[in-house]
Amino acid sequence: MGRYAKEPDNPAKSCKARGSNLRVHFKNTRETALAIKRMPLRRAQKFLKNVCEKKECVPFRRFNGGVGRCAQAKHWNTSVGRWPKKSAEFLLQLLKNAEANADYRGLDVDRLVVDHIQVNRAPCLRRRTYRAHGRINPYMSSPCHIELSLTEKEDVVSKAAENEPAKKKLSKKKLQRQKEKMMRNE
């Protein structure tokens, strides 16, 4: 078992999954992974299924040279997006694995959130393609390692409201006017 880049803050309330040397493009997978970061597990799974069906797009923020525009990217406040189906399928498999790990550990699956997800480059695999005049060019692939951890979201407890209403903050100008008024009244 390898070391993860980031250990969860509360190991009892989280679960992990990883995949090594996956034959899927690093750049597409990196953009897809960043899109599902901090999403609830159910929403992330639904999003990736929608990407496979081209109902939602993945915004391309870093590796977007030559990437076309799509209207679905407006949701992410950008104009550049794609539907990397293979990356989405690989991430769905990892999420399914992490969900099974969470179920085994007795965590509440409906409250899980994608806390950490990281995509690293794996060693390139080399093939060859034949060119004109007897030349040979490389035909490389860019596999990747993916690791993710899901954490059970804690309930947010709101502070009890005090009896006194909070004082409204006044600007310097209004404070000055109030002081002048008080000086006149005295």
Curated annotation (Swiss-Prot):
Swiss-Prot/TrEMBL GO biological process terms: cytoplasmic translation
Disulfide pattern: none
Composition bias type Basic and acidic residues, residue spans: 177-186
PROSITE patterns in alphabetical order: RIBOSOMAL_L22 (PS00464)
Cellular component annotations (GO), alphabetically ordered: cytosolic large ribosomal subunit
Residues covered by region (Disordered): 159-186
Keywords, comma-separated and alphabetical: Ribonucleoprotein, Ribosomal protein
Family as reported in the entry's similarity comment: Belongs to the universal ribosomal protein uL22 family.
Protein's name according to its UniProt entry: Large ribosomal subunit protein uL22
Organism: Aedes albopictus
Organism taxonomic ancestry: Eukaryota, Metazoa, Ecdysozoa, Arthropoda, Hexapoda
